[in-house]
Amino acid sequence: MSIEQLAETAQAMVAPGKGIIAIDESTSTIAKRFSGVGIENTEENRRAYRELLLTTPKLSDYISGAILFDETIRQKTKDGVPFAKYMADHGIIPGIKVDKGAQPLAGMPGELVTEGLDGLRARLEEYYTLGARFAKWRAVINIGEDIPSGTCIEANAHALARYAALCQEQGLVPMVEPEVIMDGDHDIETCYEVTEATLRSLFGALYEQNVVLEGTILKASMVISGKGCEEQASVEEVAESTVMCLKSTVPAILPGIVFLSGGQTDEQSTAHLNEMHQLGNLPWPLSFSYGRAMQQAALKLWSKDMTGNYAKAQQIIYERAKENGLAALGKWKG
Protein backbone atom coordinates (compact mmCIF):
# COMPACT_ATOMS: atom_id res chain seq x y z
CA MET A 1 0.00 0.00 0.00
CA SER A 2 1.20 3.49 -0.83
CA ILE A 3 2.03 6.17 1.72
CA GLU A 4 -0.83 8.19 0.21
CA GLN A 5 -3.38 5.47 1.00
CA LEU A 6 -2.09 5.05 4.56
CA ALA A 7 -2.28 8.83 5.05
CA GLU A 8 -5.81 8.90 3.61
CA THR A 9 -6.98 6.19 6.03
CA ALA A 10 -5.29 7.92 8.98
CA GLN A 11 -6.97 11.23 8.12
CA ALA A 12 -10.37 9.52 7.80
CA MET A 13 -9.86 8.03 11.27
CA VAL A 14 -9.63 11.52 12.78
CA ALA A 15 -12.24 13.24 10.58
CA PRO A 16 -13.69 16.34 12.31
CA GLY A 17 -16.20 15.45 15.03
CA LYS A 18 -15.61 11.70 14.74
CA GLY A 19 -13.78 9.23 16.95
CA ILE A 20 -13.06 5.54 17.28
CA ILE A 21 -14.97 3.06 19.40
CA ALA A 22 -12.80 0.44 21.11
CA ILE A 23 -14.59 -2.91 21.28
CA ASP A 24 -11.43 -5.03 21.31
CA GLU A 25 -11.77 -6.49 24.81
CA SER A 26 -10.19 -9.93 25.06
CA THR A 27 -12.40 -12.89 25.99
CA SER A 28 -11.20 -12.66 29.61
CA THR A 29 -11.84 -8.91 29.84
CA ILE A 30 -15.34 -9.13 28.35
CA ALA A 31 -16.00 -11.96 30.83
CA LYS A 32 -15.48 -9.44 33.67
CA ARG A 33 -17.76 -6.86 32.01
CA PHE A 34 -20.45 -9.49 31.38
CA SER A 35 -20.30 -11.01 34.86
CA GLY A 36 -20.68 -7.51 36.31
CA VAL A 37 -24.12 -7.28 34.68
CA GLY A 38 -25.09 -10.96 34.86
CA ILE A 39 -24.55 -11.99 31.22
CA GLU A 40 -23.13 -15.45 30.48
CA ASN A 41 -19.80 -15.20 28.63
CA THR A 42 -20.58 -17.35 25.56
CA GLU A 43 -19.34 -16.83 22.01
CA GLU A 44 -22.89 -16.09 20.83
CA ASN A 45 -23.46 -13.48 23.57
CA ARG A 46 -20.17 -11.81 22.66
CA ARG A 47 -21.17 -11.82 18.98
CA ALA A 48 -24.65 -10.47 19.75
CA TYR A 49 -23.21 -7.70 21.95
CA ARG A 50 -20.71 -6.62 19.27
CA GLU A 51 -23.57 -6.64 16.74
CA LEU A 52 -25.60 -4.38 19.04
CA LEU A 53 -22.71 -1.90 19.11
CA LEU A 54 -21.72 -2.02 15.43
CA THR A 55 -25.24 -1.90 13.97
CA THR A 56 -26.32 1.15 15.98
CA PRO A 57 -28.25 3.30 13.47
CA LYS A 58 -26.31 6.35 12.18
CA LEU A 59 -23.26 5.41 14.27
CA SER A 60 -20.97 6.72 11.52
CA ASP A 61 -22.27 10.27 12.18
CA TYR A 62 -19.78 10.39 15.06
CA ILE A 63 -17.70 7.19 14.75
CA SER A 64 -15.00 6.83 12.06
CA GLY A 65 -13.68 3.40 13.02
CA ALA A 66 -13.91 0.52 15.48
CA ILE A 67 -11.14 -1.60 17.00
CA LEU A 68 -12.08 -5.28 16.96
CA PHE A 69 -10.74 -8.36 18.72
CA ASP A 70 -9.53 -11.39 16.71
CA GLU A 71 -12.76 -13.30 17.40
CA THR A 72 -14.96 -10.39 16.30
CA ILE A 73 -13.31 -9.74 12.92
CA ARG A 74 -14.12 -13.38 12.05
CA GLN A 75 -17.77 -13.10 13.12
CA LYS A 76 -20.89 -12.08 11.22
CA THR A 77 -24.15 -10.28 11.87
CA LYS A 78 -27.20 -12.48 12.46
CA ASP A 79 -27.99 -11.95 8.76
CA GLY A 80 -24.66 -13.52 7.79
CA VAL A 81 -22.71 -10.37 6.84
CA PRO A 82 -19.09 -10.35 8.13
CA PHE A 83 -18.73 -7.52 10.67
CA ALA A 84 -15.81 -5.96 8.75
CA LYS A 85 -17.91 -5.81 5.56
CA TYR A 86 -20.93 -4.43 7.42
CA MET A 87 -18.72 -1.70 8.92
CA ALA A 88 -17.08 -0.76 5.62
CA ASP A 89 -20.52 -0.61 3.95
CA HIS A 90 -21.72 1.73 6.70
CA GLY A 91 -18.77 4.14 6.68
CA ILE A 92 -16.85 2.73 9.66
CA ILE A 93 -13.21 1.71 9.18
CA PRO A 94 -12.45 -1.76 10.61
CA GLY A 95 -9.46 -1.95 12.96
CA ILE A 96 -7.86 -4.85 14.82
CA LYS A 97 -6.03 -5.23 18.14
CA VAL A 98 -2.89 -7.28 17.43
CA ASP A 99 -0.79 -7.31 20.59
CA LYS A 100 -0.75 -10.36 22.86
CA GLY A 101 -0.94 -8.43 26.12
CA ALA A 102 1.48 -6.97 28.65
CA GLN A 103 3.71 -9.43 30.53
CA PRO A 104 6.14 -8.89 33.43
CA LEU A 105 9.43 -7.39 32.21
CA ALA A 106 12.19 -9.72 33.41
CA GLY A 107 14.53 -8.12 35.93
CA MET A 108 12.22 -5.14 36.41
CA PRO A 109 9.76 -5.73 39.29
CA GLY A 110 6.38 -4.05 38.76
CA GLU A 111 7.03 -3.26 35.10
CA LEU A 112 5.49 -4.72 31.96
CA VAL A 113 6.37 -5.18 28.31
CA THR A 114 3.88 -5.99 25.57
CA GLU A 115 4.30 -9.23 23.63
CA GLY A 116 3.10 -10.21 20.17
CA LEU A 117 5.82 -9.45 17.61
CA ASP A 118 6.49 -13.12 16.76
CA GLY A 119 4.50 -14.08 13.68
CA LEU A 120 2.98 -10.60 13.46
CA ARG A 121 3.74 -10.09 9.76
CA ALA A 122 1.63 -13.12 8.77
CA ARG A 123 -1.19 -12.12 11.14
CA LEU A 124 -1.30 -8.59 9.72
CA GLU A 125 -1.44 -9.99 6.20
CA GLU A 126 -4.45 -12.12 7.17
CA TYR A 127 -6.19 -9.25 8.98
CA TYR A 128 -5.83 -7.09 5.87
CA THR A 129 -7.56 -9.78 3.78
CA LEU A 130 -10.30 -9.98 6.46
CA GLY A 131 -10.96 -6.26 5.92
CA ALA A 132 -8.92 -4.48 8.61
CA ARG A 133 -7.38 -1.17 7.57
CA PHE A 134 -5.77 -0.14 10.85
CA ALA A 135 -4.34 -1.97 13.86
CA LYS A 136 -3.70 -1.25 17.52
CA TRP A 137 -0.90 -2.19 19.93
CA ARG A 138 -1.02 -1.17 23.59
CA ALA A 139 1.96 -0.69 25.87
CA VAL A 140 1.44 -0.39 29.63
CA ILE A 141 3.50 2.05 31.69
CA ASN A 142 2.96 1.84 35.45
CA ILE A 143 3.86 4.65 37.85
CA GLY A 144 5.15 3.63 41.28
CA GLU A 145 8.17 3.83 43.53
CA ASP A 146 11.20 4.25 41.22
CA ILE A 147 9.17 3.17 38.18
CA PRO A 148 8.88 3.40 35.28
CA SER A 149 12.55 2.81 34.48
CA GLY A 150 14.11 4.07 31.28
CA THR A 151 14.63 0.42 30.35
CA CYS A 152 10.90 -0.30 30.51
CA ILE A 153 9.98 2.79 28.50
CA GLU A 154 12.58 1.96 25.83
CA ALA A 155 11.56 -1.72 25.58
CA ASN A 156 7.93 -0.75 25.01
CA ALA A 157 8.79 2.06 22.57
CA HIS A 158 10.95 -0.34 20.54
CA ALA A 159 8.14 -2.93 20.37
CA LEU A 160 5.59 -0.27 19.36
CA ALA A 161 7.90 0.91 16.57
CA ARG A 162 8.56 -2.64 15.29
CA TYR A 163 4.81 -3.26 15.23
CA ALA A 164 4.17 0.07 13.45
CA ALA A 165 6.75 -0.66 10.74
CA LEU A 166 5.22 -4.11 10.12
CA CYS A 167 1.71 -2.60 9.92
CA GLN A 168 2.72 -0.09 7.28
CA GLU A 169 4.50 -2.80 5.28
CA GLN A 170 1.19 -4.72 5.18
CA GLY A 171 -0.97 -1.69 4.32
CA LEU A 172 -2.44 -1.06 7.78
CA VAL A 173 -2.34 2.24 9.67
CA PRO A 174 -0.67 1.59 13.04
CA MET A 175 -2.38 3.05 16.09
CA VAL A 176 0.35 3.27 18.74
CA GLU A 177 -0.94 3.26 22.32
CA PRO A 178 1.52 3.86 25.16
CA GLU A 179 -0.87 3.96 28.14
CA VAL A 180 0.40 5.60 31.31
CA ILE A 181 -1.80 3.90 33.91
CA MET A 182 -4.01 6.00 36.23
CA ASP A 183 -3.67 3.59 39.18
CA GLY A 184 -1.56 4.95 42.03
CA ASP A 185 -1.40 7.97 44.29
CA HIS A 186 0.92 10.03 42.08
CA ASP A 187 0.12 13.67 41.29
CA ILE A 188 -0.47 15.21 37.88
CA GLU A 189 3.12 16.53 37.70
CA THR A 190 4.49 12.98 37.98
CA CYS A 191 2.09 11.81 35.28
CA TYR A 192 3.29 14.67 33.06
CA GLU A 193 6.96 13.70 33.47
CA VAL A 194 6.31 10.02 32.75
CA THR A 195 4.06 10.74 29.76
CA GLU A 196 6.61 13.16 28.31
CA ALA A 197 9.47 10.65 28.68
CA THR A 198 7.32 7.88 27.18
CA LEU A 199 6.25 9.91 24.13
CA ARG A 200 9.80 11.21 23.51
CA SER A 201 11.09 7.64 23.52
CA LEU A 202 8.24 6.43 21.29
CA PHE A 203 8.69 9.04 18.57
CA GLY A 204 12.47 8.50 18.63
CA ALA A 205 11.91 4.78 18.07
CA LEU A 206 9.36 5.38 15.30
CA TYR A 207 11.89 7.63 13.53
CA GLU A 208 14.70 5.07 13.90
CA GLN A 209 12.55 2.32 12.37
CA ASN A 210 11.46 4.38 9.36
CA VAL A 211 7.80 4.55 10.37
CA VAL A 212 5.93 7.12 8.26
CA LEU A 213 4.20 9.45 10.71
CA GLU A 214 1.73 10.67 8.07
CA GLY A 215 0.26 7.16 8.16
CA THR A 216 0.27 6.68 11.95
CA ILE A 217 -2.21 7.55 14.73
CA LEU A 218 -1.32 8.06 18.41
CA LYS A 219 -3.70 6.72 21.04
CA ALA A 220 -2.67 8.65 24.13
CA SER A 221 -3.55 8.69 27.80
CA MET A 222 -4.39 12.06 29.31
CA VAL A 223 -2.07 13.75 31.77
CA ILE A 224 -4.13 13.26 34.92
CA SER A 225 -3.82 12.71 38.69
CA GLY A 226 -3.44 9.12 39.88
CA LYS A 227 -6.71 7.61 41.08
CA GLY A 228 -5.42 7.46 44.65
CA CYS A 229 -4.01 11.00 44.73
CA GLU A 230 -5.63 13.15 47.43
CA GLU A 231 -5.52 16.23 45.24
CA GLN A 232 -7.35 15.57 41.95
CA ALA A 233 -6.51 17.97 39.13
CA SER A 234 -9.36 20.06 37.70
CA VAL A 235 -10.75 19.60 34.19
CA GLU A 236 -8.83 22.72 33.11
CA GLU A 237 -5.55 21.45 34.58
CA VAL A 238 -5.90 18.07 32.87
CA ALA A 239 -6.64 19.73 29.51
CA GLU A 240 -3.77 22.23 29.80
CA SER A 241 -1.21 19.68 31.01
CA THR A 242 -2.19 17.14 28.37
CA VAL A 243 -1.98 19.60 25.47
CA MET A 244 1.31 21.06 26.73
CA CYS A 245 2.82 17.59 27.06
CA LEU A 246 1.69 16.58 23.57
CA LYS A 247 2.96 19.81 22.03
CA SER A 248 6.39 19.21 23.53
CA THR A 249 6.68 15.64 22.23
CA VAL A 250 4.44 14.88 19.23
CA PRO A 251 5.47 16.05 15.73
CA ALA A 252 2.89 18.27 14.04
CA ILE A 253 2.93 16.06 10.92
CA LEU A 254 1.06 13.30 12.77
CA PRO A 255 -2.50 13.15 11.30
CA GLY A 256 -4.17 13.04 14.71
CA ILE A 257 -4.32 11.90 18.31
CA VAL A 258 -7.14 9.95 19.94
CA PHE A 259 -7.47 9.55 23.70
CA LEU A 260 -8.19 6.47 25.74
CA SER A 261 -10.54 6.88 28.69
CA GLY A 262 -8.36 4.74 30.97
CA GLY A 263 -10.74 4.37 33.87
CA GLN A 264 -12.13 7.93 33.83
CA THR A 265 -15.89 8.24 34.23
CA ASP A 266 -17.98 8.75 31.08
CA GLU A 267 -18.44 12.42 31.87
CA GLN A 268 -14.81 13.11 32.83
CA SER A 269 -13.46 11.68 29.58
CA THR A 270 -15.88 13.83 27.55
CA ALA A 271 -15.31 16.99 29.60
CA HIS A 272 -11.51 16.71 29.39
CA LEU A 273 -11.56 16.27 25.60
CA ASN A 274 -13.97 19.18 25.19
CA GLU A 275 -11.82 21.45 27.38
CA MET A 276 -8.69 20.77 25.31
CA HIS A 277 -10.46 22.30 22.32
CA GLN A 278 -11.13 25.50 24.27
CA LEU A 279 -7.36 26.09 24.35
CA GLY A 280 -7.17 26.56 20.58
CA ASN A 281 -4.05 26.47 18.40
CA LEU A 282 -3.80 22.66 18.27
CA PRO A 283 -1.30 21.25 15.75
CA TRP A 284 -3.36 18.05 15.17
CA PRO A 285 -6.97 16.89 15.52
CA LEU A 286 -7.68 15.60 19.04
CA SER A 287 -10.44 13.02 19.29
CA PHE A 288 -11.45 9.92 21.25
CA SER A 289 -11.01 6.16 21.18
CA TYR A 290 -13.08 5.12 24.15
CA GLY A 291 -14.11 1.63 25.21
CA ARG A 292 -15.75 1.49 28.61
CA ALA A 293 -16.73 5.17 28.46
CA MET A 294 -18.73 4.44 25.29
CA GLN A 295 -20.25 1.10 26.27
CA GLN A 296 -20.91 0.89 30.01
CA ALA A 297 -24.38 2.41 30.22
CA ALA A 298 -25.65 0.57 27.12
CA LEU A 299 -24.33 -2.81 28.32
CA LYS A 300 -26.10 -2.37 31.65
CA LEU A 301 -29.43 -1.63 29.98
CA TRP A 302 -29.11 -4.42 27.37
CA SER A 303 -28.30 -6.98 30.07
CA LYS A 304 -31.68 -6.41 31.72
CA ASP A 305 -33.66 -7.35 28.59
CA MET A 306 -31.62 -8.31 25.53
CA THR A 307 -34.57 -8.08 23.13
CA GLY A 308 -36.81 -5.47 24.75
CA ASN A 309 -34.00 -2.99 25.46
CA TYR A 310 -32.14 -3.45 22.14
CA ALA A 311 -33.20 -0.17 20.52
CA LYS A 312 -32.83 1.77 23.78
CA ALA A 313 -29.30 0.43 24.31
CA GLN A 314 -28.37 1.46 20.76
CA GLN A 315 -29.82 4.91 21.42
CA ILE A 316 -27.49 5.24 24.45
CA ILE A 317 -24.49 4.24 22.30
CA TYR A 318 -25.48 6.84 19.71
CA GLU A 319 -25.86 9.51 22.42
CA ARG A 320 -22.42 8.71 23.88
CA ALA A 321 -20.90 8.85 20.38
CA LYS A 322 -22.61 12.19 19.77
CA GLU A 323 -21.44 13.70 23.08
CA ASN A 324 -17.85 12.70 22.37
CA GLY A 325 -18.10 13.77 18.74
CA LEU A 326 -19.20 17.22 19.91
CA ALA A 327 -16.39 17.25 22.50
CA ALA A 328 -13.92 16.48 19.69
CA LEU A 329 -15.00 19.81 18.16
CA GLY A 330 -15.10 21.64 21.51
CA LYS A 331 -18.89 21.98 21.23
CA TRP A 332 -20.04 19.73 24.07
CA LYS A 333 -22.27 21.57 26.55
CA GLY A 334 -22.31 19.04 29.40
UniProtKB/Swiss-Prot annotation:
Its EC number is 4.1.2.13. PROSITE patterns: ALDOLASE_CLASS_I. GO terms for molecular function: fructose-bisphosphate aldolase activity. InterPro entries: Aldolase_I_AS (IPR029768), Aldolase_TIM (IPR013785), FBA_I (IPR000741). SUPFAM superfamilies: Aldolase. It catalyses: beta-D-fructose 1,6-bisphosphate = D-glyceraldehyde 3-phosphate + dihydroxyacetone phosphate. Keywords: Glycolysis, Lyase. GO terms for biological process: glycolytic process. It comes from the Bacteria. Pathway: Carbohydrate degradation; glycolysis; D-glyceraldehyde 3-phosphate and glycerone phosphate from D-glucose: step 4/4. Disulfide bonds: none annotated. Belongs to the class I fructose-bisphosphate aldolase family. This is Probable fructose-bisphosphate aldolase class 1.
